Design a protein with these regions (language model features):
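Aromatic-rich peripheral "rim/lid" segments of glycoside hydrolase catalytic domains that contact
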Residues: 25-45, 51-156
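Acidic/histidine-rich catalytic cores of soluble enzymes
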Residues: 1-20, 24-27, 37-46
Length: 156
């Protein structure tokens, strides 16, 4: 980005695609990326935000949408609902991310989620079709998950 700006190109913002998991990306590195982009004098746009709660096949990596794996129960363990411990872990991850966004609210122009409710998350069909994921802030009945209230309180 510095090279482009040095050539006189106007750059107003940069998007950080944020398909996250319960344990990735490393939050310190994620926050450093926000700082690094903001240091270039642009607004940071958090894009495609979701959190994958499901295990991925060994050898899986990146975002190659052509990459598909066979459905196996071990990669789809929460068809009857998210267990309380996983829900707690997911809520903590949402809050950890939104605490970073709040801390850097002067540097971040917007946060865009990659969908509205769990029913329609792309992660139900990729990288394994037919899975049940809980990747968004609204459940399958379009009801806000409890963590939404915590996020709202954070920004008040």
């Amino acid at each position: 980005m510095k090279n482009l700006k040095a050539k006189g190109l106007r750059i107003d913002g940069v998007g950080m695609q944020s398909h996250n998991g319960l344990d990735y990306p490393n939050l310190d590195e994620y926050e450093k990326s926000i700082d690094a982009f903001a240091a270039c004098g642009v607004k940071v746009l958090i894009t495609e935000l979701d959190i994958n709660v499901l295990p991925n096949p060994q050898g899986f990596g990146g975002a190659d949408i052509a990459q598909n794996f066979e459905l196996q129960q071990k990669y789809n363990p929460y068809t009857a609902g998210l267990p309380a411990d996983k829900e707690k872990e997911l809520n903590k991850r949402w809050m950890d991310l939104f605490k970073i966004y709040y801390k850097h609210r002067d540097q971040i122009g917007r946060v865009t989620l990659w969908g509205v409710c769990d029913e329609n998350s792309w992660l139900n069909g990729w990288p394994i079709k037919g899975r049940t994921n809980y990747a968004l802030l609204f459940d399958r009945q379009y009801q806000a998950k409890p963590v939404v209230n915590d996020i709202i309180k954070l920004f008040k």
